[in-house]
């Protein structure tokens, strides 16, 4: 699998090198700043809602009239977008989308795109080293805006992707006053996993630093995205590794069906998902995705972390609550494979009673949830092991809001292979109650068997459970 991943990454890079786009900027296409800013190579384009794809107007440090010419709004928020490494020296397709989304949410804001394409186009280690110079450029620009125009840094929000996240962090560490916020969008891992805080994104770089980790697969230092927490709040959607719809099998299927044209997008799909999750949070403000603090993704998969007490849950993206703990908090959530990404999380606890002495491993079940608004049927889940007279907790999620839970069905699936023992005598357990906690509402519900006690048998019909208890369940959970 690792060799397939490396092959597809290399293939994606090669395909990128064959493409062209109107966003290309020649290395010698210089925009000269004022006398005190002659060493700044990065360019700062103020894009407009009417022209999200082109750098038509540049804010030039030291040239005050450039700010007026670009119609910079001095009383509104400013989003500063910093791209990452590029093979082609071109803007990637996500840039206009990330420009458009803040304007839809904050119509009077300023969205500035930092162009460091000529430096970002080098071999990766060289471009990684350039993040320090880019960070200095951005800091000088921000300091100039603050000093020359008294622009408040409380209005500045840096959005850095991949290498751009570390450039944003370095910029934040060098401004005269702290900027309001830095959002790191899957900060790059290689060359930064073991770097000291001054050389990478860290919580000290802004008043608040939030980070999305979406492609951390692989050993530390070799994964595309940085694995360790580097902000006040670090969120790991789907465990922070591969994202839904981005797996290698999907890439191979697309190659077979459509040829090589789209494979480069699939290769970087999980890395870029961080950007689209943030865009989603800007566009779908009424339904923010919720993440939950947890010590490990394994504990999260067991449903053990769906608590919102003492800031243990938070919104993903733009509407995040700015919680500044003494140490970084790692948070997890599940998402859909496409926008809107929000899902609804549930912890399910089942006590299996019986006289079976054997331990069953890797058993597949299906659960169906029925609510006041909708239903979600045949949700598969696997328990690594089950044995009699033990309670098991696990996480499930639905892609639709089903409302208040009313009923559920549980089915124990047959093995995919033929088993004489199962054919001769199907194993089973008795289940009296099932406990469910909804992460988004924090409500707990106990379901009872419709027959007082249900006998769940492998490969047999589903058993039905109905709501049986309402008393004092919906207090704040622990």
Swiss-Prot record:
Region described as Interaction with GPIHBP1: 35-56, 446-470
Q: What class of enzyme is it?
A: hydrolase
Q: Which residues are glycosylated?
A: 73, 389
Q: Which reaction does it catalyse?
A: a triacylglycerol + H2O = a diacylglycerol + a fatty acid + H(+); a 1,2-diacyl-sn-glycero-3-phosphocholine + H2O = a 2-acyl-sn-glycero-3-phosphocholine + a fatty acid + H(+); 1,2,3-tri-(9Z-octadecenoyl)-glycerol + H2O = di-(9Z)-octadecenoylglycerol + (9Z)-octadecenoate + H(+); 1,2-di-(9Z-octadecenoyl)-sn-glycero-3-phosphocholine + H2O = (9Z-octadecenoyl)-sn-glycero-3-phosphocholine + (9Z)-octadecenoate + H(+)
SMART domains reported in the protein's UniProt record? LH2
Localization, UniProt:
Cell membrane; Secreted; Secreted, Extracellular space, Extracellular matrix
Give the residues annotated as active site.
Answer: 162, 186, 271
Q: Name one Pfam family in it.
A: PLAT
Positions bound to Ca(2+): 197, 200, 202, 205
**What is the activity-regulation note?**
The apolipoprotein APOC2 acts as a coactivator of LPL activity. Ca(2+) binding promotes protein stability and formation of the active homodimer. Interaction with GPIHBP1 protects LPL against inactivation by ANGPTL4.
Which Enzyme Commission number(s) are on file for it? Answer: 3.1.1.34, 3.1.1.32
Query: Which residue range or ranges hold the PLAT domain?
Result: 344-467
Q: Name one GO cellular component term.
A: chylomicron
Q: Which residues carry this modification: 3'-nitrotyrosine?
A: 124, 194, 346
| Keyword hit for Disulfide bond | yes
GO BP term, example = triglyceride catabolic process
Signal peptide start and end residues: 1-23
Specify whether Nucleotide-binding is a keyword of the entry. no
Free-text function comment from the UniProt entry: Key enzyme in triglyceride metabolism. Catalyzes the hydrolysis of triglycerides from circulating chylomicrons and very low density lipoproteins (VLDL), and thereby plays an important role in lipid clearance from the blood stream, lipid utilization and storage. Although it has both phospholipase and triglyceride lipase activities it is primarily a triglyceride lipase with low but detectable phospholipase activity. Mediates margination of triglyceride-rich lipoprotein particles in capillaries.
Into which family does the record put it? Belongs to the AB hydrolase superfamily. Lipase family.
* Subunit description: Homodimer. Interacts with GPIHBP1 with 1:1 stoichiometry. Interacts with APOC2; the interaction activates LPL activity in the presence of lipids. Interaction with heparan sulfate proteoglycans is required to protect LPL against loss of activity. Associates with lipoprotein particles in blood plasma. Interacts with LMF1 and SEL1L; interaction with SEL1L is required to prevent aggregation of newly synthesized LPL in the endoplasmic reticulum (ER), and for normal export of LPL from the ER to the extracellular space.
Q: Which disease is it linked to?
A: Defects in LPL are a cause of chylomicronemia syndrome, also known as type I hyperlipoproteinemia. Animals exhibit reduced body mass, growth rates, and increased stillbirth rates.
What this protein is called in its record is Lipoprotein lipase
Species source reads Felis catus
Q: Which gene encodes it?
A: LPL
């Amino acid at each position: 699998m690792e060799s397939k991943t490396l092959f597809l990454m290399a293939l994606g890079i090669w395909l990128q090198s064959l493409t062209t786009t109107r966003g290309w900027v020649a290395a010698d296409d210089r925009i000269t700043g004022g006398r005190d800013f002659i060493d700044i190579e990065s360019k700062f384009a103020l894009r407009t809602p009417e022209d999200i794809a082109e750098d038509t107007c540049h804010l030039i440090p030291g040239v005050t009239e450039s700010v007026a010419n670009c119609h910079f709004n001095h009383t509104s928020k400013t989003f500063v977008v910093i791209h990452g490494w590029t093979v082609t020296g071109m803007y990637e397709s996500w840039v206009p989308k990330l420009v458009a989304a803040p304007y839809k949410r904050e119509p009077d804001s300023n969205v500035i795109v930092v162009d460091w394409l000529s430096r970002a186009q080098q071999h990766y280690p060289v471009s990684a080293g350039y993040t320090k110079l880019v960070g200095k450029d951005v800091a000088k620009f921000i300091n100039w805006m603050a000093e020359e125009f008294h622009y408040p840094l409380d209005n500045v929000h840096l959005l850095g992707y991949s290498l751009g996240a570390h450039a944003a962090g370095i910029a934040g560490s060098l401004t005269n006053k702290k900027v309001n916020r830095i959002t790191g969008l899957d900060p790059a891992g290689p060359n930064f996993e073991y770097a000291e805080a001054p050389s990478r994104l860290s919580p000290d770089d802004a008043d608040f630093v939030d980070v999305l980790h979406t492609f951390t697969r692989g050993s530390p230092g070799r994964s595309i995205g940085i694995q360790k927490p580097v902000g006040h709040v670090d969120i790991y959607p789907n465990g922070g590794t591969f994202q839904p719809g981005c797996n290698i099998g999907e890439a191979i299927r697309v190659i077979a069906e459509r040829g090589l044209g789209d494979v480069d997008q699939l290769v970087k799909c999980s890395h870029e998902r961080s950007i689209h999750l943030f865009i989603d949070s800007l566009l779908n403000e009424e339904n923010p995705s919720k993440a939950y603090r947890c010590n490990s993704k394994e504990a999260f998969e067991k449903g053990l972390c769906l608590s919102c007490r003492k800031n243990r849950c938070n919104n993903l993206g733009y509407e995040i609550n700015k919680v500044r703990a003494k140490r970084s908090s790692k948070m997890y959530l599940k998402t859909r494979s496409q926008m809107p990404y929000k899902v609804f999380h549930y912890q399910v606890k089942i006590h299996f009673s019986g006289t079976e002495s054997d331990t069953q491993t890797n058993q597949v079940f299906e659960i169906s949830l029925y609510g006041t608004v909708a239903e979600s049927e045949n949700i598969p889940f696997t328990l690594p092991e089950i044995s009699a007279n033990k309670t098991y907790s696990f996480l499930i999620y639905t892609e639709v809001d089903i409302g208040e839970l009313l009923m559920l069905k549980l089915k124990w699936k047959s093995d995919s292979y033929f088993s004489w023992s199962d054919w001769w005598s199907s194993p089973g357990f008795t289940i009296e109650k099932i406990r469910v906690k909804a992460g988004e509402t924090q409500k707990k519900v106990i379901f009872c068997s419709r027959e007082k006690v249900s006998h769940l048998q492998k490969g047999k019909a589903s058993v039905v459970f109905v709501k049986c208890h309402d008393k004092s369940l919906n207090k704040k959970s622990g």
